[in-house]
UniProtKB/Swiss-Prot annotation:
GO terms for cellular component: cytosolic small ribosomal subunit. It comes from Suberites domuncula (Sponge). Keywords: Cytoplasm, Ribonucleoprotein, Ribosomal protein. The keyword Ribonucleoprotein applies. This is Small ribosomal subunit protein eS1.
Length: 252
C-alpha cells in the first residue's frame, strides 16, 4: 500500500485542540439552612448548575438529602446521632431543609451490644398531628441488679414481649399527639428512650434504651407557610431579602 493513502494516519490532525472549560464556572454555591429546632442553623454549602433556559437551579436542589451529625447541629461532641435533612424550598441563596430521618452512628450501636444481657428491639408506624407518617425503631438492653451474684441478666421471652409492647405503646403515645417539630425536639435529647426505660422498670430493669432510627414514610402536601414556621420568622426574612438582592445588583 502506498504511503500517504492511509486516511487514518492524517485523522485527528486537522483543526485546533478542543478548548477545556472548567465545569465549576457554570455552578453556584448555596447555603444549607437547618430548621429552627437545632442550635446551628447554617450547616454547610451545596453546589448546583446555574439556571439555563428552562432548566432551573432550584429544581436541581429540591429533594437533596443532607446527613448531618447532631454533634455539629447542637455543638455537642458527646452526640452520637445523625439527622437527615431534605431540601424543600429555595429562598435566594438559602436552601431550606426539613427533617427526613434519623439514625445512630454505627460505632455507638456496635458498642452497646455486649454478652450476658438480652437485646430487645421494637418498631412502630406512627402518624403525627400534621400528617407525617414515621417509622420508629427502638433498642434496649437488660441490666444487672446492683446486688446481683449471677453473671447473666437474661429476660424471659414473656418479659421481652411485655417490654416490646410497652416500647410500642410509649412511642405511639409520645408521637401521635404532637407535630413533626415537637417530635424532633424529643428526638434530640432522646426523652422517648428515657421514658421507655422508666416504664419498663416494673417488668425488667433496662439500660441503654434509645430510639435508634426514624424513617419518614409519608409526607403531607408541601406547604411553604409550614416550612417558614419551621425555620422561624428570621429565616423567612433572610430568604425574602436574598430573593430581591440579585435584580438590584443587575440594575446597578
Amino acid at each position: 500500500m502506498a504511503v500517504g493513502k492511509n486516511k487514518r494516519l492524517t485523522k485527528g490532525k486537522k483543526g485546533t485542540k478542543k478548548k477545556i472549560i472548567d465545569p465549576f464556572t457554570k455552578k453556584d454555591w448555596y447555603d444549607v439552612k437547618a430548621p429552627s429546632m437545632f442550635a446551628v442553623r447554617n450547616i454547610g454549602k451545596t453546589l448546583v448548575t446555574r439556571t439555563q433556559g428552562k432548566k432551573l437551579a432550584s429544581d436541581g436542589l429540591k429533594g437533596r438529602v443532607f446527613e448531618v451529625s447532631l454533634a455539629d447541629l447542637q455543638n455537642d461532641e458527646q452526640s452520637f446521632r445523625k439527622f437527615r435533612l431534605i431540601s424543600e424550598d429555595i429562598q435566594g441563596k438559602n436552601v431550606l431543609t426539613n427533617f427526613h430521618g434519623m439514625t445512630m452512628t454505627t460505632d455507638k450501636l456496635r458498642a452497646l451490644v455486649k454478652k450476658w444481657q438480652t437485646l430487645i428491639e421494637a418498631n412502630v408506624d406512627v402518624k403525627t398531628t400534621d400528617g407525617y407518617l414515621l417509622r420508629l425503631f427502638c433498642i434496649g438492653f437488660t441490666k444487672r441488679q446492683p446486688n446481683q451474684i449471677k453473671k447473666t441478666s437474661y429476660a424471659k421471652s414473656s418479659q421481652c414481649r411485655s417490654i416490646r409492647k410497652k416500647m410500642v405503646d410509649v412511642m405511639t403515645r409520645e408521637v401521635s399527639q404532637i407535630d413533626l417539630k415537637e417530635t424532633v425536639n424529643k428526638l434530640i435529647p432522646d426523652s422517648i428512650g428515657k421514658d421507655i426505660e422508666k416504664k419498663c422498670q416494673s417488668i425488667y430493669p433496662l439500660h441503654d434504651v434509645f430510639v435508634r432510627k426514624v424513617k419518614v414514610l409519608k409526607k403531607p402536601k408541601f406547604d411553604i407557610g409550614r416550612l417558614m414556621d419551621l425555620h422561624g420568622e428570621s429565616a423567612g426574612g433572610k430568604g425574602a431579602t436574598d430573593t430581591f438582592e440579585p435584580p438590584v445588583q443587575e440594575s446597578v
